[in-house]
């Protein structure tokens, strides 16, 4: 559980966090941030681990994923399994295919399709997510995934493709309206 506060009132933060900890002993990871920007972005904020681990573990079809507070992971794991299975099925990835996973997060989809692909390249802007993607790939004994951190519109260029290879399959999750025009043009 990650609780976001606006006011940096240590006394009240500790009172609430202790209440949550005592009231819900099944919580294995209790974190908080103080975000005085009054918005819902937290990637530039410090995460404080109040109790337990600063991550959770998730299993999906035999793959194991460590997920930190700033790492993207689908919130409904059961539906994510269905989505990833369908993605793999529809993409018809073969052992000869180079796959790009744009907005890879913790590398979940990249690793999910890696067993069918020659190589998978994942890109995301969140450094913590890419670090977790590498850790997860190692944890899952997946050696054909490479991950890059950077702003998609800056990193996903002709030079990047020349260096890493022209993809046979590109996966974007989500296929967002907010995808920068340069990224859409590159695809």
Regions found by a protein language model. Give the residues of each.
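Carbohydrate-binding surface patches
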Residues: 1-8
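Rossmann-like S-adenosyl-L-methionine
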Residues: 12-187
């Amino acid at each position: 559980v990650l609780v976001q506060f606006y006011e940096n009132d240590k006394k009240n933060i500790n009172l609430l966090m202790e209440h949550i900890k005592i009231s819900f002993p099944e919580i294995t990871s209790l974190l908080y941030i103080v975000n005085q920007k009054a918005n819902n972005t937290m990637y530039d904020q410090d995460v404080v681990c109040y109790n337990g681990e600063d991550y959770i573990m998730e299993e999906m079809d035999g793959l194991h994923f460590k997920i930190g507070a700033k790492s993207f992971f689908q919130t409904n794991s059961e539906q994510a399994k269905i989505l990833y299975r369908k993605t793999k099925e529809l993409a018809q990835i073969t052992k000869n295919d180079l796959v790009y996973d744009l907005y890879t997060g913790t590398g979940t989809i990249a690793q999910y399709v890696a067993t069918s692909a020659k190589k998978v390249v994942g890109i995301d802007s969140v450094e913590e997510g890419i670090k977790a993607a590498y850790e997860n790939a190692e944890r899952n004994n997946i050696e054909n995934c490479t991950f890059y951190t950077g702003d998609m519109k800056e990193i996903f260029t002709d030079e990047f493709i020349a260096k890493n290879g022209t993809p046979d399959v590109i996966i974007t999750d989500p296929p967002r309206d907010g995808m920068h025009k340069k990224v859409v043009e590159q695809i």
